[in-house]
Curated annotation (Swiss-Prot):
GO terms for biological process: glycine decarboxylation via glycine cleavage system; nucleoside metabolic process. Pfam families: GDC-P. InterPro entries: GcvPA, GDC-P_N, GDC_P, PyrdxlP-dep_Trfase, PyrdxlP-dep_Trfase_major, PyrdxlP-dep_Trfase_small. Belongs to the GcvP family. N-terminal subunit subfamily. This is Probable glycine dehydrogenase (decarboxylating) subunit 1. It comes from Solibacter usitatus (strain Ellin6076). Keywords: Oxidoreductase. The lineage of its organism: Bacteria, Pseudomonadati, Acidobacteriota, Terriglobia, Bryobacterales. The glycine cleavage system is composed of four proteins: P, T, L and H. In this organism, the P 'protein' is a heterodimer of two subunits. Signal peptide: none annotated. NCBIfam families: PRK00451.1. The gene is gcvPA. Its EC number is 1.4.4.2.
Length: 449
């Protein structure tokens, strides 16, 4: 049976039809002796996530539940039930690219709302109708910057996700686009702005950074923008943890923002599908890859939506196209749209604050390697054993530990990247600390369970 809530005006109409002014009058004929004149002895209301977590804990008495502290570009966030309810509707689930606008107004409307919300989150003027994922959005953003500036060289920070850098390298190799990396500060884990300035030249068309970066550190976007713009390059800012946008200042100093929306109700999955985005300042709108949905008027003067710009090779001549994005990602983008709608501006901020609080609670017991400010993940040194050996021990305790960094950063072979989200329970964090260190915590941080 569906639950159909009633508005206050609807309640008044129903009471008037019954000839009463309050719901209590409907029960006035019942003797006081049989009426309950106190509130029911019920616990306070809890959120949907807490209800699911309550029953999951009961179910885990008969199952093997592992606590996970993995992040590194794919994050364990709660997925509201409403997301599946909406995206499983046939008109969304079975539809393809909305080539014929007159019969695809529903799909086009949701894409338009998606673009609007992405612009609000990123501080940009225009957002496209999604990309394959964050990793492929990065080279698309780099090529876009090269086209816009007429300069073919790209500088990218070593604090950008290593696998994103690999994807960029694959694209760049076949585009004849030279890519050079610049370093990070060993103490803070953030951008080495002096190294960036040394490597900048008049042939550089794009500077690419990530915030929060791969180590979880919040980067100096404004300072990087000043260095890039001084030499006529565009600044591309990447994000892999979209929830951070609910709390951190939007990267409005960037020219292009590219990122991954997996955190917005897209389940962690090896190989995807995920949803990437590119958002830009308005003057670069004609360089944006993929599709843009715009608002217009139909022949009767009614509001209507259409594909305003479609610079992909299915729509225009191949040599004129900006990209070869072909798979319809609108369904995955719809998941993120429903997520953003369910949480709203304040809800997303509260979600981000929960992530921040839990990660800092964990950091108060595990000493972070870097001094830079971080969001919901940070780097820790493994004491007395390698991160790989530590993870083997943790698995025996039903704990999936952090990501060993040696495979990506040889200089950090003794360290691992650990993440905490709103899904991370305090008991699990305490268990991780107990399993990794014998040192008691000296700092107390308030955090909800």
């Amino acid at each position: 049976m569906r639950y159909l809530p009633k508005s206050e005006s609807e309640r008044r109409q129903m009471l008037e039809a019954c000839g009463v002014s309050t719901p209590e009058e409907l029960f006035a004929h019942l003797p006081d002796a049989v009426r309950l004149n106190r509130p029911l002895n019920l616990a306070p209301g809890i959120s949907e996530y807490e209800i699911v977590q309550y029953f999951r804990e009961r179910a885990e008495q008969n199952a093997n539940g592992y606590a996970s502290f993995l992040g590194a570009g794919v994050y364990n966030h709660y997925r509201p039930v409403l997301v599946d309810t909406v995206v499983s509707r046939g008109e969304f689930l079975t539809s393809y690219t909305p080539y014929q606008a007159e019969i695809a107004q529903g799909t086009l409307t949701t894409i338009f709302e998606f673009q609007t919300m992405i612009c609000q989150l990123t501080g940009m003027d225009v957002a496209n109708a999604s990309m394959y994922d964050g990793s492929t959005a990065v080279p698309e953003a780099a090529m876009m910057a090269v086209r816009a500036t007429g300069k073919g060289r790209v500088l990218i920070s070593r604090t950008v996700h290593p696998e994103y850098r690999e994807v960029l390298g694959t694209y760049a190799k076949h585009q004849g686009m030279p890519v050079q990396e610049f370093g990070y500060v060993a103490e803070s884990g953030g951008l080495d702005l002096e190294d960036l300035e040394r490597k900048m030249d008049d042939l550089t068309g794009a500077v690419i950074i990530q915030t929060p970066n791969f180590f979880g550190i919040v980067e100096q976007v404004k300072a990087a923008a000043e260095i890039a713009h001084k030499r006529g390059a565009l600044l591309v800012v990447i994000f892999t943890e979209a929830v951070s946008l609910g709390l951190l200042e939007p990267p409005a100093d960037a020219d292009i923002v590219a990122g991954e929306l997996q955190s917005f109700a897209i389940s962690p999955s090896y190989g995807g599908p995920y949803a990437g985005i590119i958002a830009v300042k308005e003057k670069y709108i004609r360089q944006v890859p993929g599709r843009l949905v715009g608002q217009s008027l139909d022949s009767r003067g009614n509001r209507a939506f259409c594909l305003t710009l479609s610079t992909r090779e299915q729509h225009i001549r191949r040599e004129k196209a900006t990209s070869n994005i072909c798979t319809n990602q609108a369904l995955i983008a719809l998941m993120a749209t429903v997520f953003m709608t369910v949480y709203g501006k304040q809800g997303l901020r509260e979600l981000a604050e929960q992530n921040l609080a839990k990660a800092h609670y964990l950091a108060s017991k595990l000493k972070p390697r870097f001094t830079g400010k971080f969001f919901n993940e940070f780097v820790v040194r493994a004491e007395g054993q390698t991160p790989e050996e530590l993870n083997k021990q943790l698995l025996k305790k039903k704990i999936i530990g952090g990501l060993p960094l040696g495979r990506f950063y040889p200089e950090l072979a003794d360290s691992y990247l650990v993440c905490a989200t709103e899904m991370t329970r305090r008991a699990d964090m305490d268990a991780l600390v107990a399993a990794t260190t014998a040192q008691p915590a000296t700092e107390t941080v308030e955090v909800t369970a």
